[in-house]
UniProtKB/Swiss-Prot annotation:
It comes from Desulfotalea psychrophila (strain LSv54 / DSM 12343). It comes from the Bacteria. One of its GO terms (cellular component) is ribonucleoprotein complex. Belongs to the bacterial ribosomal protein bL28 family. Pfam families: Ribosomal_L28. This is Large ribosomal subunit protein bL28.
Length: 64
């Protein structure tokens, strides 16, 4: 699925833009996804979309 982290499942969330006059229009906050090469549990190298929190926390094992 597009715009979803393949490790943790984090996806878009919705809310409102609020102007100075308090007019509200719908908007989406998107996760900070990066395309990275990673090693799976079986040892294969695959490319996937992963959020930066998973990359920083070490949940992604990068190939040597």
């Amino acid at each position: 699925m597009a715009k979803v982290c393949e490790i943790c499942g984090k996806g878009p969330i919705t809310g409102n833009n609020v102007s100075h006059a308090h007019n509200k229009t719908r908007r989406r906050w998107l996760p900070n996804l990066k395309k990275v090469r990673m090693v799976t549990a079986s040892g294969a190298t695959v490319r996937g979309k992963v959020c930066t929190r998973c990359i920083r926390s070490g949940a992604v094992v990068k190939p040597a």
